[in-house]
UniProtKB/Swiss-Prot annotation:
Family, similarity comment: Belongs to the class I-like SAM-binding methyltransferase superfamily. rRNA adenine N(6)-methyltransferase family. RsmA subfamily.
Subcellular location(s) per record: Cytoplasm
Primary enzyme class: transferase
Top-level taxonomy: Bacteria, Pseudomonadati, Acidobacteriota, Terriglobia, Terriglobales
Binding site for S-adenosyl-L-methionine: 21, 23, 48, 69, 94, 127
Xref: Gene3D superfamilies: Ribosomal RNA adenine dimethylase-like, domain 2, Vaccinia Virus protein VP39
Catalytic activity: adenosine(1518)/adenosine(1519) in 16S rRNA + 4 S-adenosyl-L-methionine = N(6)-dimethyladenosine(1518)/N(6)-dimethyladenosine(1519) in 16S rRNA + 4 S-adenosyl-L-homocysteine + 4 H(+)
InterPro entries per the UniProt record, alphabetical: KsgA/Erm (IPR001737), rRNA_Ade_diMease-like_C (IPR023165), rRNA_Ade_Mease_Trfase_CS (IPR020596), rRNA_Ade_methylase_Trfase_N (IPR020598), rRNA_adenine_dimethylase (IPR011530), SAM-dependent_MTases_sf (IPR029063)
One GO CC term on file: cytosol
Gene that encodes it: rsmA
Protein name: Ribosomal RNA small subunit methyltransferase A
GO molecular function: 16S rRNA (adenine(1518)-N(6)/adenine(1519)-N(6))-dimethyltransferase activity; RNA binding
Amino acid sequence: MPKMAAEKNSKPAKKAKLGQNFLSDASGALKIVEALGDISDATVVEIGPGRGAITDHLAKRAKRLIAVEIDRVLAAQLRLRYSRLENVEILEADILAVELSTVLAQRIGPLRDLRPTKPEKVRIIGNLPYYITSDILLRLFEAHALIDFAVIMVQKEVADRIAAKPGTRDYGLLSATSQLYTHVEKLFTLPPGSFNPAPQVHSTVLKLQMEPKLEALGVDEEGFDSFLKLIFGQKRKTLFNNLRVAYDMAKAREAMKAVGLKSDVRAEAVALEKTAQLYNELRKG
């Protein structure tokens, strides 16, 4: 996974260079937190707390809060701000490099006594940096077994792609992968004025309930993930031409015919269920 690079001696005012626009709408922040539901007995992981607009509400409500912030200055400020709260942990780290299972196993102070007897599923929340949204989502999908659901804010255009249906202009690899692992629900949209500095786009809050469809589709995780990347590899090409990169031409043609797909169809027009059928057909013999 690619990693974000923090600038040395970075200042909060320059955080936008890392793709961060700080949420400044108090009512919007509260609305996002309320989308998590009752978290009095839950562990919440916040991605990119920034100046703490969402964190303030989480700290008062969550049984345990782990806020992951890459910016050294912001992390230090947050650590000082919540130093007296035993349920809050500020982790200065790149979220793309964080192993969720390792973080959850670490208990500090009196929290050591709260270690569960079986793995807990956490709730994720965050205003995701625009330029690494896809990378963060893929990282979360990898850890789907540890996550209950995520409430995330992303660029509206990206939200449209995540929730897009097959056969529509926005449907692609991000749509298929998101819908393979989660049930996607659009909650609400915030205007540019809700942030500082104000971005040039609207932002949409999504709820991603982890509901992996791997077993129902009869596919293996690693293989099918790679298959999706293959068939969406070059959007201008037909599904058949993308398959030719990895499969014999005759085998690809026969498999498509066997599952009822025309040779000129494009991957974005094929439903996830049909894509899984094609994948399994190609695995035969």
